Amino acid sequence: MYLIADWRRTHYSKDVIPEMDGQEVTLMGWVHSIRALGKLAFVILRDRAGTIQAVVPKQKVDEETFEIAKKLGKEDIVAIKGKVVANEKAPKGFEVIPIEIRVLNKADAPLPLDPSEKVSAEIDTRLDKRFLDIRRPKIQAIFKIRSEMLKSIRKTFADEGFIEVNTPKLVASATEGGTELFPISYFEKEAFLGQSPQLYKQMMMAGGFDKVFEIAQIFRAEEHNTRRHLNEAISIDSEMSFVNEKDAMAMLEKVVYNCYSDIEYNRPNEIELLELNWEIPEKTFDKVTYTEAIDIAIAKGVEIEWGEDLSRAAERAVGDEMGGLYFITEWPTQTRPFYTLPHKHDNKVCKAFDLMYKELEISSGAQRVHKYDLLVQNISNMGLNPDSFETYLEAFKYGMPPHAGWGLGADRFAMVLTAQDNIRECVLFPRDRQRLTP
């Protein structure tokens, strides 16, 4: 066994090309596979960027190097210093002949999970051994695309003059008055894990920040057990002053469009590896009102009445009709939180919207109430006590501008981008009703 000592990686696997014939390289990673055939050994080394083949001919390497190569096991951690040799018959037009191999760590055998993907495993098994599962190239591709998504979103917000903020995740009361909260002991008080940064975003509008965004955890104590729900999720939230819901929708369109464009440009290998049918959407998405969505659902045989939230059957019906990315707008006021602004001409309808991808909701937003008296009235009308929102309401007494915003589910959006049908595939260590480890 060796320490890394004075060795340092000089290249990732993807950086080595046939034109480097004769050049010395130092590679580091995992043994993806090993074949020893008499006086010849083939070692496939895997790193973050892909795989590369090292060929170990007994007559061209010293005896110690050949013996080390023969005894390698799958997933051993190795460092290989060798020379690039152009070879048209090799898989990538070259191979690496080792000068020295250092075994940095041995992997136990048998492996509880096969990162080479030759043996499939159920998702629960994969999540139990997630550290092995994420070695798989296709799983890494999901998270590289997710990383590119977050990078693109931050860049778009920065280009548009937004300030990134961090709001508390330990809170004294519910954001929306709901019961979907995780209570915790906070010294001598009861506290909760935050279910949304919504109230804080609005308070920052009163503070004159004008445009803010946050990318952070939210916690929902919902007893769902579906492929699209988790109890800990990443939410991408934004809020803007002196705008309405249409401006907020336009900003969301820009964020989503730029994600598709940036991923196509920066992650073509991952798109190919996942065999994604990649299409950059139009810059402006289709829109359908809630009333029109209800009509579509009823026409397709779904039993639903105006004023009800859309059921799964209704979402599927509308998704089948609309396809791709689209907004549902002008929701019934009774279906939305107290801070949503009703339409002036018809207070039964509010200035709220959802962004859908087929049948999946990925974002929700609205123009907010910015008048103190109306906000207090809305809170009371929903059976909540305004006193519970005292610190929030105070921000509306001393000059709150009109404002609007939205929250985009990062995990669900990653599902859409990578064409996964289970949200757990897009979260490193998902938390649901059954899973609290690893």
Swiss-Prot record:
Q: Please give the catalytic activity noted in the UniProt record.
A: tRNA(Asx) + L-aspartate + ATP = L-aspartyl-tRNA(Asx) + AMP + diphosphate
Could you mention a single GO BP entry for this protein? aspartyl-tRNA aminoacylation
Q: InterPro entries attached here?
A: Aa-tRNA-synt_II, aa-tRNA-synth_II, aa-tRNA-synth_II/BPL/LPL, Asp-tRNA_synthase_2, Asp/Asn-tRNA-synth_IIb, NA-bd_OB-fold, NA-bd_OB_tRNA
Q: Which residues bind Mg(2+) 3?
A: E361
For the ligand (ATP), the binding residues are R220, A221, E222, R228, H229, L230, E361, G409, A410, D411, R412
CDD domains for the chain: AsxRS_core, ND_PkAspRS_like_N
Describe how the cofactor binds: Binds 3 Mg(2+) cations per subunit. The strongest magnesium site (Mg1) is bound to the beta- and gamma-phosphates of ATP and four water molecules complete its coordination sphere.
- Record-listed E.C. numbers: 6.1.1.23
Residues marked Important for tRNA non-discrimination (site): P91
Q: Where found?
A: Cytoplasm
Q: Where does Mg(2+) 2 bind?
A: E361, S364
**Pfam families, sorted:** tRNA-synt_2 (PF00152), tRNA_anti-codon (PF01336)
The UniProt annotation puts the region (Aspartate) at: 198-201
List, in alphabetical order, the Gene Ontology terms for molecular function in this entry: aspartate-tRNA ligase activity; aspartate-tRNA(Asn) ligase activity; ATP binding; magnesium ion binding; RNA binding
Identify the keywords attached in UniProt to this record, alphabetized.
Aminoacyl-tRNA synthetase, ATP-binding, Cytoplasm, Ligase, Magnesium, Metal-binding, Nucleotide-binding, Protein biosynthesis
Q: Give disulfide pairs as residue numbers.
A: none
Required cofactor(s): Mg(2+)
What PANTHER family does the annotation carry?
ASPARTATE--TRNA LIGASE, CYTOPLASMIC (PTHR43450:SF1), ASPARTYL-TRNA SYNTHETASE (PTHR43450)
How does it associate, per the subunit comment? Homodimer.
Function (record text): Aspartyl-tRNA synthetase with relaxed tRNA specificity since it is able to aspartylate not only its cognate tRNA(Asp) but also tRNA(Asn). Reaction proceeds in two steps: L-aspartate is first activated by ATP to form Asp-AMP and then transferred to the acceptor end of tRNA(Asp/Asn).
**Descriptive protein name:** Aspartate--tRNA(Asp/Asn) ligase
Q: Which species is this record about?
A: Methanococcus maripaludis (strain DSM 14266 / JCM 13030 / NBRC 101832 / S2 / LL)
Lineage, uppermost ranks: Archaea, Methanobacteriati, Methanobacteriota, Methanomada group, Methanococci
